[in-house]
């Protein structure tokens, strides 16, 4: 039988088959011996009431959260409470785009104000949606994004991910208030799982977090963003880090000077590069 892994709990995989029936099964030990770990989103073959016997080749996979075969990863970032942080957005995007997955930006709590970065990110080619929980109009606007797609939500704790999931699915996941002391919400989501939404769409909500190690090399980071990858082809050196190289040797620096790449994006990139250098020491 064939199916898709919808959730994992203590080594038991919840698989939805082609007839929309669910099966809770372990995986064959051979996967463990080969250091292959089944992930939420994997397409698999299994023997009914026995084991997962095969994992099909993945379109892509992501480390945090551990998921496979993803169409979009949606970065959920609040405009206020907590304040919008372009550095975190760019950090997530570097991580996402390096895995060849398309990032999308959801700006929540739009009723509290507008984000000055919306136009900036749209000019860079990203889809940006502003979401106000005062109205349900945004639900219609995002529906097409989910049609026949598997999308992941990721972002800081306290930015409204759980409220967003509740609105989309009609479920009632636990919502916890912002901690005024820490200025971030407490973690509410625990298990990575697929939830069916809209027209044959799939949503994977993930645990919120306030920090994320980038886990990229300097070379991977330098060509992580789609725009950097395209413009970086014209740098004089293939190993250009767009950092200390002369401006006439680095096409990324030239693009910043020409306002093709926003200054804030380049500044965030340099900050990320410093993080990578510190991690590698």
UniProtKB/Swiss-Prot annotation:
Keywords: Cytoplasm, GTP-binding, Hydrolase, Metal-binding, Nucleotide-binding, Ribosome biogenesis, RNA-binding, rRNA-binding, Zinc
Residues binding GTP, per UniProt: 108-111, 155-163
Keyword Zinc: yes
InterPro entries noted in UniProt: G_CP_dom (IPR030378), NA-bd_OB-fold (IPR012340), P-loop_NTPase (IPR027417), Ribosome_biogen_GTPase_RsgA (IPR004881), RsgA_GTPase_dom (IPR010914), RsgA_N (IPR031944)
Localization of this protein: Cytoplasm
Subunit text: Monomer. Associates with 30S ribosomal subunit, binds 16S rRNA.
NCBIfam families linked: ribosome small subunit-dependent GTPase A
Name under which the protein is recorded: Small ribosomal subunit biogenesis GTPase RsgA
Originating species: Mycoplasmopsis agalactiae (strain NCTC 10123 / CIP 59.7 / PG2)
Lineage start: Bacteria, Bacillati, Mycoplasmatota, Mycoplasmoidales, Metamycoplasmataceae
Name of the coding gene: rsgA
């Amino acid at each position: 039988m064939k199916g898709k892994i919808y959730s994992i709990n203590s080594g038991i995989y919840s698989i939805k088959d082609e007839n929309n029936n669910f099966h809770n099964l372990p995986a064959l030990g051979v996967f463990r011996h080969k250091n292959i770990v089944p992930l939420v989103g994997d397409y698999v073959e299994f023997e009914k009431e026995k084991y997962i016997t095969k994992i099909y080749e993945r379109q892509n996979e992501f480390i945090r959260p551990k998921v496979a075969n993803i169409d979009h990863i949606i970065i959920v970032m609040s405009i206020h409470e907590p304040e919008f942080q372009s550095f975190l957005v760019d950090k997530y995007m570097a991580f996402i785009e390096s895995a060849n997955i398309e990032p999308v930006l959801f700006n929540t709590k739009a009723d509290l104000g507008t984000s000055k970065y919306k136009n900036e990110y749209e000019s860079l080619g990203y889809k940006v949606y502003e979401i106000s929980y005062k109205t349900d109009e945004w639900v219609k606007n995002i529906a097409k994004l989910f049609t026949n797609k598997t999308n992941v939500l990721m972002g800081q704790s306290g930015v409204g991910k759980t409220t967003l999931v509740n609105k989309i699915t009609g479920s009632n996941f636990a919502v916890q208030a912002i901690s005024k002391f820490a200025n971030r919400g407490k973690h509410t989501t625990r298990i990575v799982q697929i939830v069916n939404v809209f027209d044959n769409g799939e949503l994977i909500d993930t645990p919120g977090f306030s920090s994320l190690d980038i886990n990229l090399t300097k070379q991977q980071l330098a060509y992580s963003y789609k725009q950097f990858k395209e413009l970086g082809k014209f740098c004089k050196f293939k190993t250009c880090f767009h950092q200390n190289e002369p401006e006439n040797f680095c096409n990324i620096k030239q693009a910043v000077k020409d306002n093709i790449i926003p200054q804030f994006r380049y500044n965030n990139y340099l900050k990320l590069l410093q993080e990578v250098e510190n991690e590698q020491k």
